Amino acid sequence: MAAMLLLPIEAGHAGWLSDMFKGSPKPGKPAKQATAPKPAAVPKRIVAAKPVTPAKSAASSKHRPVKLAALGPVALPPSALKPAAPTCDPAKFRIVVDVGHTAESGGAKSARNVDEFLYNHRLARRIEQKLKADGFTETRLLLTEGKARRSLVRRVAAASELQANLFLSIHHDSVPTKFLEEWEFEGKKRGFSDRFGGYSVFVSRKNPDFRTSLAFAELLAKEMKAFGLPYAEQYSQPVMGRHRHPLLNKETGVYSYDELVVLRKTRMPAVLLEAGSIINRDEELEMASPERRNIISSGVVAAVKQFCDRRWAILGPL
């Protein structure tokens, strides 16, 4: 469709319009006689072989030039007619940040005998804070109680009740028992494994919105990689036995974990982040630092922003 554009023309260059803007004579007074016709200047952008100039009154010739509008259709490129792409309204985007495990069922033990739950809680709280600071005010931190299995069912139910647009579960990694070695820490023998390290991102292909889950997982993994963090490659290796998982993207470290309850049973896109290995002695120290928590939480926020923008553009306001 052609768009209409109004082009400016100087009044002095449009003598044929002058009669339209002159006032009519007052009653009882004769109209002023027009002076001898003067040739009007021809605009440089108009080429005329024999310009014809109508007479111009002395009064109108004294007026200062003003912008007038000349109508005429002008074709514009399609890009000029395309509406601006909508962007996400973070205040309407609901995210559940799930703290993996519970105080009663603490998950893996770190190389220094700290429950995984404590690491999960600290990182999840930092993620919640940064998301809210960036406008995602509907973010909810999900803390559950009790034993592991019952806790998983509660997480799924809570996310559904909150009508979340995205479910993100926060965990820290360990290794199968067969890889553990012993060392002494604070006068006691502890288990450790420095063999593996890095983050990993999991989705379930049985999630009702698997493709969208995978889309967010890819964004999150790319942000982790952009910060220079390596991903845990061991989950695709036969040595992991029953802990082995299909690698969906070897560039970013996205795996499928099809039967995990919080990924399979949730009714919204769901992703699990293993932020790093706490059974690796060096990596545990990094995971315990505020600097690493800031890096990971910044990556999560960046991924959520991109994800929200894309969903908003496709589905419209939530």
Q: Each predicted region: which residue ranges?
A:
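Catalytic-site microenvironment of enzymes
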Residues: 1-318
